[in-house]
Amino acid sequence: MIDFRNRLIDVQEKTVKAQGYLILNQEEKANNLLKEAFKDVLVLAKSSSPIRKEALAVQALIEDNLTALNKIEDVKDPKLVFDFANSDFIPQHLIAFEDSLYYFNPYYKGIIRTSGDTLERINADYGFNLAAATSFGLALFSKPDKISFLKDGRLEPAFALELPKSDTVFIAMTSFKDSLYFLEKGTGMIIKYREPFFENADQPKYWIQAQEKKALGAKSLEVTGSVYVLADDNAIWEYRGGLLLDKTYLSVFPFPQKLAKITALPSLSGLAVLEPSQGRIILIDRQGSLIRQFRSEDFLNLKAVAFSKDGKFL
């Protein structure tokens, strides 16, 4: 009992010290100390703890402070744009292109387009796994190697990309300038294809230099000038010129558990990081510093996010 009491006093002292930092506008110091205190109090707030009631009160105080410091905006009632619950289509992916939103899944033959209150079905002979907005149309990829472009509302005939290996599987795709970038399943390797895009037009190139470290088991990919890869351990790897430049673990509260996807913010100013298991979207700048977090119960099991051109809506 005495040990539990002393540990709680230590947590309370850290909390008071952090409050002092806040008065002095030293938010980073306060944030770091409160995160430390929060980890300490979790053990004391367990059901078996003899001081659980007091520990829970301290935990709530710390959590309130961390919520404010970590720029969490709770979204109570996000506006419903379309409800696919009673249709024959279940969207698994979403992408914004020009002034429309496009929804697709690998089992639905075609793609759904919405603009305002208008819904349009664009038929195809196959479903799509990945998509990327480019200056020459919306690129749509169907495993293992088919790619086609949607231009002016018309889906052009698909053609086959040459794969680097016969057993290559792509799990993420993005675009930058005149190139498409693919993330290879399991290996963390990135394959780059350059314009023009037609069958066998460009030999696939492994973009990361051969001797450089790769994020094995990586889950997501984005390019904003640097190439960012979301690794299986929640680290974000930054590459430039085919070389590993940096590896970042997000220092945010709530502590990341299972980050799922990264996508570029408008004007390539940073990244949005999706964590559906905690119902949130984390916005960071290119250096990995926190911009803002959006949290909602409606974001649990979130699969994708898209932004308006001006960045005011998601």
Predicted regions mapped to residue ranges:
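Amphipathic, non-membrane alpha-helical rod segments
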Residues: 17-52, 95-96, 100-118
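Alpha-helical linker/edge segments of TPR/alpha-solenoid repeat scaffolds
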Residues: 57-84
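A short beta-strand motif characteristic of beta-propeller blades
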Residues: 76-86, 117-124, 156-164, 199-214, ...
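Beta-strand-rich domains and repeat architectures in extracellular enzymes and scaffolds
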Residues: 79-112, 125-130
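Repeated scaffold domains used in trafficking and secretory/extracellular systems
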Residues: 85-93, 125-136, 166-178, 212-224, ...
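Conserved beta-strand positions in repeat-built beta-propeller and related beta-rich domains
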Residues: 98, 103-107, 139-145, 174-175, ...
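WD40 beta-propeller blade core
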Residues: 110-112, 148, 191, 237, ...
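Short loop/turn segments that connect beta-strands within beta-propeller blades
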Residues: 114-118, 151-154, 194-198, 239-244, ...
